[in-house]
Amino acid sequence: MNLEVIAQLTVLALIVISGPLVIALSAARKGNL
C-alpha cells in the first residue's frame, strides 16, 4: 500500500472516531454544568 493511501485511511478513521467522541464530551460537559 502507498503511504498516501494509509495517510488518507488514518485521517478518515480519526474523523469517524473523533466525531462521536466530541459529541459525547460536549454532552458530558453540558451535563456536568
From Swiss-Prot:
It is a single-pass membrane protein. A core subunit of photosystem II (PSII), probably helps stabilize the reaction center. GO terms for biological process: photosynthesis. InterPro entries: PSII_Ycf12_core-subunit. This is Photosystem II reaction center protein Psb30. Belongs to the Psb30/Ycf12 family. Keywords: Chloroplast, Membrane, Photosynthesis, Photosystem II, Plastid, Thylakoid, Transmembrane, Transmembrane helix. PSII is composed of 1 copy each of membrane proteins PsbA, PsbB, PsbC, PsbD, PsbE, PsbF, PsbH, PsbI, PsbJ, PsbK, PsbL, PsbM, PsbT, PsbX, PsbY, PsbZ, Psb30/Ycf12, peripheral proteins of the oxygen-evolving complex and a large number of cofactors. It forms dimeric complexes. It comes from Huperzia lucidula. The lineage of its organism: Eukaryota, Viridiplantae, Streptophyta, Embryophyta, Tracheophyta. The keyword Transmembrane applies. The chain crosses the membrane at residues 5-25. NCBIfam families: PRK13686.1. It comes from the Eukaryota. It is found in: Plastid, Chloroplast thylakoid membrane. GO terms for cellular component: chloroplast thylakoid membrane; photosystem II.
